[in-house]
Amino acid sequence: MKLNELRDNPGARPKSKRLGRGIGSGKGKTSGKGVKGQKAREGVSLNGFEGGQLPIYRRLPKRGFNNVNRKDYAPLNVGTLAALIESGKIDAGQKITEATLRAAGVYAGSKLAGVRLLGRGEISQKVEIEVSGASASAIAAIEQAGGSVTTTVARAEPASA
């Protein structure tokens, strides 16, 4: 068998029924749309219209909002950082900054506010890294390997009750 000899199984793609071609076809005259009315006309019925019943988007209360000041950070796991160092994309001997990470192709996009270091994976190399943010487990992993983490964005501590 060759690629140019491949065929569908018989009946795998049934031909669609042609509409409005006589009463003998089973879909003649009104083409399965019933008689008159809004839904029999050309075009689609109104989205969200429930026949006069109060629609669900008006029955339920408004919730939440989109924060225009929200900042998104590119995630970078410790294991990924170790792999980048081993592959030679990043030099562990020099201080690693967000500019270094961007040049190495770790993240791109002007909408991201920076990099957040996360703790998944393991690292054995001693590195000095400066990122926007870091999780406690990531800082512990880097410091256990003899390195240091500097964060440029201060994280607010939760208010104690």
Swiss-Prot record:
Annotated region (Disordered), positions in chain: 1-42
Function according to Swiss-Prot or TrEMBL: Binds to the 23S rRNA.
Similarity comment: family membership: Belongs to the universal ribosomal protein uL15 family.
Amino acid composition bias (Basic and acidic residues), ranges on this chain: 1-10
Keywords: Ribonucleoprotein, Ribosomal protein, RNA-binding, rRNA-binding
One MF annotation (Gene Ontology) recorded for this entry: structural constituent of ribosome
Official protein name in the record: Large ribosomal subunit protein uL15
Keyword Zinc: no
